[in-house]
Swiss-Prot record:
Segments for region (Wedge domain (WED)): 123-214
Protein name: CRISPR-associated endodeoxyribonuclease Cas12f1
Region (RuvC-I): 224-374
Residue ranges, annotated region (RuvC-II): 433-453
Applied uses, from the record: The small size of this enzyme and its ability to function in E.coli suggests it may be useful for genome editing.
Enzyme class: hydrolase
The species this protein was found in: Syntrophomonas palmitatica (strain DSM 18709 / JCM 14374 / NBRC 102128 / MPA)
Residues engaged in binding Zn(2+): 376, 379, 395, 398
Disulphide bonds in the chain: none
Summary of the function given for this chain in its UniProt record: CRISPR (clustered regularly interspaced short palindromic repeat), is an adaptive immune system that provides protection against mobile genetic elements (viruses, transposable elements and conjugative plasmids). CRISPR clusters contain sequences complementary to antecedent mobile elements and target invading nucleic acids. CRISPR clusters are transcribed and processed into CRISPR RNA (crRNA), which requires a trans-encoded small RNA (tracrRNA), but not this protein.
Active-site positions on this chain: 228, 327, 434
GO molecular function, one term: metal ion binding
Its EC number(s): 3.1.-.-
């Protein structure tokens, strides 16, 4: 059993002086901004001390322990409002920042890092705050001020943040962190260093990292995950061993693409109608905004592909799949009407999936995608009209996608509102076309199965032929029989004019 670390981000709704949340602190935003500024000033002072210390000759330096103690006491002296453990976190974080950047600073490759006065986070050790649930209110009890300061202010050392916990997943995490003495130790979560931080819109958040036990998933090579690059959905996946599925909507991609296209047209029109002052600086300067836009689009695509690849591999690990089957991308844009596939760097996505899967010991197999969207994953019947629309699949032979089926036991019946087998609720089956394709792709050796079926029925199929022994196979760069690499690649099928 291992451990993993994640974090939850909770918006602060209000701050109170008591755990019952009856005495409201009206100036809490101003108080947090002041504390954030104190943390930034103390952190910058520590960084300057570290720079001065390591700039001195070694024989003139005090011990590093004495240096860190001096930094701590200077922080407390500069801002007595800060609790000792908060001051300690400031010193430790400054040390980490210095260690990461010291070499680059002395080489004059970067300037001295600084904490921003307006957005520096307030860091608190995990033993000076706790989570409280009072009826339906979620509260974080924080020791925000030192004892010396609280005596002068008369408001106490602790503040109570009322936070927004809106979804069931976050509520479950909050409850598990709060109940440290969980009955099942395998489900207990341990809180980490709390950060209180303001975003660029001026809203305050509590970021709570937590550690939780993870069980090592045993990957089974016979469990296969099929990944379909679809039209209705950008990416859809299914498994050969279960009915579970997942998908990624390509809406954000289309939105970004339209925004970039509109911006590019706008810039081109500006260049076209610009005055002589701009044109006189040469072509390179005139086209610089378009180049910047192209770089932005490239970075967005790279980020999205990383995110998609991570989600796909994580889904495979969660289901214990030792194999991921994806479509062989050669010629795929010529055989589909998907704008996503034609305009997106899907080869880069495939490469990222392969690399991330390799890190976890998962094998990635590229299969020939022919007829995977037209084949019924239940009975194997291949027919173009099976896909009644871009998003709906209905098999013309077995009725998959148009049957009446029980939700509980999946019994198929002709009519009725109640299952004849278990008495459960029945409803008409709706099958997503991309899910059916992903289910086909998750079948081991699916391209070979489809090729043999096509040859049997006389359906045209783009197969690969070995020049040495004449063996015909669905995909691959080497012959499955003789191992020769001298194979005849099929020509791309193009739509008739």
């Amino acid at each position: 059993m291992g451990e993993s670390v994640k974090a939850i981000k909770l918006k602060i709704l209000d701050m109170f002086l008591d755990p019952e949340c009856t005495k409201q602190d009206d100036n809490w935003r101003k108080d947090l901004s002041t504390m954030s500024r104190f943390c930034a000033e103390a952190g910058n002072m520590c960084l300057r001390d570290l720079y001065n210390y390591f700039s001195m000759p070694k024989e003139d330096r005090i011990s590093s322990k004495d240096l860190y103690n001096a930094m701590y006491h200077k922080t407390k002296l500069l801002h007595p409002e800060l609790p000792g453990k908060v001051a300690n976190q400031i010193v430790n974080h400054a040390k980490d920042v210095w260690k990461r950047n010291a070499k680059l600073i002395y080489r004059n490759q970067i300037s001295m890092p600084t904490y921003k006065i307006t957005t520096a986070p307030i860091r608190l050790q995990n033993n000076i705050y706790k989570l409280i649930k009072n009826k339906n209110k979620y509260i974080i009890d924080v020791q925000l001020y030192s004892k010396e300061y609280s005596k002068d202010s008369g408001k106490g050392t602790h503040r109570y943040f009322l936070v927004a916990v809106r979804d069931s997943s976050t509520r479950m995490i909050f409850d598990r962190i709060m109940s440290k003495d969980h009955i099942d130790s395998s489900k207990s979560y341990t809180q980490g260093q709390l950060q209180i931080k303001k975003d660029h819109q001026g809203k305050w958040y509590c970021i709570i990292p937590y550690t939780f036990p993870t069980h090592e998933t045993v990957l089974d090579p016979d469990k296969v995950m099929g990944v379909d690059l679809g039209v209705a959905k950008a990416v859809y996946w299914a498994f050969n061993s279960s009915y579970k599925r997942g998908c990624i909507d390509g809406g954000e991609i289309e939105h970004f693409r339209k925004m970039i296209r509109a911006r590019r047209v706008s810039i081109q029109n500006q260049i076209k109608h610009s005055g002589d002052a701009r044109k006189g600086h040469g072509r390179k300067r005139a086209l610089k905004p378009i180049e910047t836009l192209s770089e932005k689009e490239k970075n967005f695509r790279d980020t999205i592909n990383h995110r998609y690849a991570n989600r796909i591999v994580e889904a495979a690990i969660k289901q214990g799949c030792g194999t991921i089957q994806i479509e062989n991308l050669e010629g795929i844009a010529d055989t589909t009407g998907s704008k996503f596939l034609k305009n997106w760097p899907y080869y880069d996505l495939q490469t990222k999936i392969v690399n991330k899967a390799k890190e976890h010991g998962i094998t990635v197999v590229a299969i020939n995608p022919q007829y995977t969207s037209q084949r019924c994953s239940m009975c194997g019947y291949i027919e173009k009209t099976n896909r009644s629309s871009q998003a709906v699949f209905e098999c013309k032979q077995c009725g998959y996608g148009s049957r009446t089926i029980c939700i509980n036991c999946r019994h198929v019946q002709v009519s009725g509102d109640v299952c004849e087998e278990c008495g459960g609720i029945v409803k008409k089956e709706n099958v997503n076309a991309d899910y059916n394709a992903a289910k086909n792709i998750s079948t081991p050796y699916i391209d070979q199965i489809i090729m043999e079926k096509c040859l049997e029925l006389g359906i045209p199929y783009r197969s690969i032929t070995c020049k040495e022994c004449g063996h015909i196979q669905a995909s691959g760069n080497t012959c499955e029989v003789c191992g020769s690499t001298n194979i005849l690649k099929p020509k791309k099928i193009r739509k008739a004019k």
